[in-house]
Amino acid sequence: MKKISLPKIGIRPVIDGRRMGVRESLEEQTMNMAKATAALITEKIRHACGAQVECVIADTCIAGMAESAACEEKFSSQNVGVTITVTPCWCYGSETIDMDPMRPKAIWGFNGTERPGAVYLAAALAAHSQKGIPAFSIYGHDVQDADDTSIPADVEEKLLRFARAGLAVASMKGKSYLSVGGVSMGIAGSIVDHNFFESWLGMKVQAVDMTELRRRIDQKIYDEAELEMALAWADKNFRYGEDQNASQYKRNEAQNRAVLKESLLMAMCIRDMMQGNKTLADKGLVEESLGYNAIAAGFQGQRHWTDQYPNGDTAEALLNSSFDWNGVREPFVVATENDSLNGVAMLFGHQLTGTAQIFADVRTYWSPEAVERVTGQALSALAEHGIIHLINSGSAALDGACKQRDSEGKPTMKPHWEISQQEADACLAATEWCPAIHEYFRGGGYSSRFLTEGGVPFTMTRVNIIKGLGPVLQIAEGWSVELPKAMHDQLDARTNSTWPTTWFAPRLIGKGPFTDVYSVMANWGANHGVLTIGHVGADFITLAAMLRIPVCMHNVEEAKIYRPSAWAAHGMDIEGQDYRACQNYGPLYKR
């Protein structure tokens, strides 16, 4: 099967078309802007899979309709999914702009005095606004000399933020969300909304009953040699935690082995269903070998599967991690309980950062007073205003233990292409696998148990769908918190100590839903959330604007908010602008 090519970024150098000295004097400077932009993006950004981003530059500078059409023909043949137009001078606005309505686009107008790059930028953006095709504006804060080929820091920040978000949009388009099962325990996010995926993300939904997973396991529609490798890997690396089940529910060694085997098979088969596996074709299973072209998936599990078969905890945790028996690799995106909306938040985070994502219940708000009452100890430092307990039995990536280290030796979660095998092993060593609690999971299973290291910056997100409004995005930047061991043990024991825990302290800004930690919890729109490494809320905001998803809650500094220029015409309140613009333009792929 032919591999689907990755989207590219097209660079469009536009120029004043007047000959007899004007165009000729600008050719080199204009093309050099395009080359510098391409070099910056190629150096600084990778696709979520780890591949280097490829930029395609128009063959000539673009002065009018003919050269614009020639550029578009080239881009169409090379899978260009995002465009950046660059110029140091005046050009002919609507004659030179990118008119593809579904392709994210930005314009960098050079801030210089010799030629009016800012004037073209304003004219072109006016054309975009009038035609209903929003574009992002890039204009340096400080004037540069005409022969200055450097890219200022503020311009670089906008170029890279736009490129990251634009590539996420282009990478999701044409892919599918694999819904394995249906609605889990009445959770609204697992009522998978096909219109949302199609109209806002440009994706399809592939709905598959959980009996397909059962069929693949029972009929050995998997790589049997790989199963043996996975079992050997688990035997070497899994540490098993306390079995908290009553004696009548404890399994013997043979039963536990069967649960482990089926859990690993679930991981293999869900992966094969998502992306395909050519080994199956070698076994004569050509249809099954193709997969469903899924960039994200969800597994219902509870309760129609878990009342009889091992739960999805092990499979989900391993798939969402950056490593398994095959070594370090790109993490998958698999949502527990088929919560497709949390799965989309995971997908956004992975596409923007290349890292694994932590799926969690937004379980409990602990006030400083409640913590002191229960433990006799006071919260301090990052936790002084209270904490939120993020915990779930299922698909928290093992990277979430934060045993990887950044360039300063601090705990983090790295893009998979930066993770060493030693760091992967450290995450495994920090994880215990605890037998599932029988009352919840009658078919058994193993839940991963780890504790996220403290002081790590995270961004918590969630997508919700509001009837009459559509999808909205919530964002809360903050930090993981390390509690004294005795305090952690007491608080953890009050819920389920066999599950992975992250203690989270959102950054407070003294107003709205970020007045205090309680308000963050009270304003969260659903029972699940996602943690993405770093304070990357600004990237989420830019991505959401491209997709026309308004942001209903965030604590990102206003100076970092980057949306299309047309948003400014939708009122003076920056968040009201977002709602009005998203309503005005409608979903990116509306029909």
Swiss-Prot record:
Keyword list, A-Z: Carbohydrate metabolism, Cytoplasm, Fucose metabolism, Isomerase, Manganese, Metal-binding
CC cofactor: Mn(2+)
Subcellular location: Cytoplasm
Known pathway: Carbohydrate degradation; L-fucose degradation; L-lactaldehyde and glycerone phosphate from L-fucose: step 1/3
Swiss-Prot/TrEMBL GO biological process terms: D-arabinose catabolic process; L-fucose catabolic process
Residue positions of the active site: 337 (proton acceptor), 361 (proton acceptor)
Similarity-based family: Belongs to the L-fucose isomerase family.
NCBIfam families: fucI, PRK10991.1
Xref: PANTHER family: L-FUCOSE ISOMERASE
Protein's name according to its UniProt entry: L-fucose isomerase
Name of the coding gene: fucI
